[in-house]
């Protein structure tokens, strides 16, 4: 007897309902034309890591907890004297999520993390890049339930980029709205 593979809740929702909604709305002739989520990139810039490498390692550990996947420390490519930055110094960390981890992260972001943001009024609907990708910034990474602020001691901001296969911003906005992204009216 074969075991059934785990499928994230949002992936099931996409396969059952969202794909048909988008096909009806935009009139796609082929199933492969329907936009879908491609990847989610989490980026955390840690300016204090220039002086203390442990800050970058702590940020990478926190980002790994949030993403459920090991974070990669990013290094500077050029020296900038005004920031006292030399080449190949740690300046942040990043994670790229795909497949099941991507759907799980988006589910946690929408249902758990964003409602914990202070004075949250909704996501900016103008943060699309013109090619169907959406970016948002978070000021404190402690809104995620995986992070214990008492152990971390610091809070860093992070950038979240949701990459889709949509060709236009309208298609991407319809896709993300179907996934219950809370856009401002």
Curated annotation (Swiss-Prot):
PTM annotation: Both N-terminus methionine truncation and retention have been observed for this protein.
GO biological process: translation
Protein source organism: Rhodopseudomonas palustris (strain ATCC BAA-98 / CGA009)
SUPFAM superfamilies found in the cross-reference section: RL5-like
Protein name: Large ribosomal subunit protein uL5
Gene assigned in the entry: rplE
UniProt lineage: Bacteria, Pseudomonadati, Pseudomonadota, Alphaproteobacteria, Hyphomicrobiales
Pfam family, one: Ribosomal_L5_C
Domain of life: Bacteria
Gene Ontology CC terms: ribonucleoprotein complex; ribosome
Annotated GO MF terms: rRNA binding; structural constituent of ribosome; tRNA binding
Subunit structure of this chain's protein: Part of the 50S ribosomal subunit; part of the 5S rRNA subcomplex. Contacts the 5S rRNA and the P site tRNA. Forms a bridge to the 30S subunit in the 70S ribosome.
Family affiliation: Belongs to the universal ribosomal protein uL5 family.
Function according to Swiss-Prot or TrEMBL: This is one of the proteins that bind and probably mediate the attachment of the 5S RNA into the large ribosomal subunit, where it forms part of the central protuberance. In the 70S ribosome it contacts protein S13 of the 30S subunit (bridge B1b), connecting the 2 subunits; this bridge is implicated in subunit movement. Contacts the P site tRNA; the 5S rRNA and some of its associated proteins might help stabilize positioning of ribosome-bound tRNAs.
Stretches of the chain forming a coiled coil according to its record: none
Keywords of the record: Ribonucleoprotein, Ribosomal protein, RNA-binding, rRNA-binding, tRNA-binding
């Amino acid at each position: 007897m074969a075991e059934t593979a785990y499928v994230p809740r949002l992936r099931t929702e996409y396969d059952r309902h969202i794909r048909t909604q988008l096909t009806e709305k935009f009139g796609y002739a082929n199933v492969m034309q329907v936009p879908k989520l491609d990847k989610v990139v989490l980026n955390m810039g840690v300016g204090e890591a220039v002086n203390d490498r442990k800050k970058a390692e702590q940020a990478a550990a926190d980002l790994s907890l949030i993403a459920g996947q090991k974070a990669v420390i990013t290094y500077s490519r050029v020296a900038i004297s005004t920031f006292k930055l030399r080449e190949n110094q740690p300046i942040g960390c990043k994670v790229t999520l795909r497949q099941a981890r991507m759907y799980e992260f988006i589910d946690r972001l929408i249902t758990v993390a964003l409602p914990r943001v202070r004075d949250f009024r909704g996501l900016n609907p103008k943060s699309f890049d013109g090619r169907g990708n959406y970016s948002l910034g978070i000021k404190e990474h402690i809104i995620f339930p995986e992070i214990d602020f008492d152990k971390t001691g610091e809070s860093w901001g992070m950038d979240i980029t949701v990459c889709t296969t949509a060709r236009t911003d309208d298609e991407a906005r319809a896709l993300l709205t179907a996934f219950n992204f809370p856009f401002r009216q």
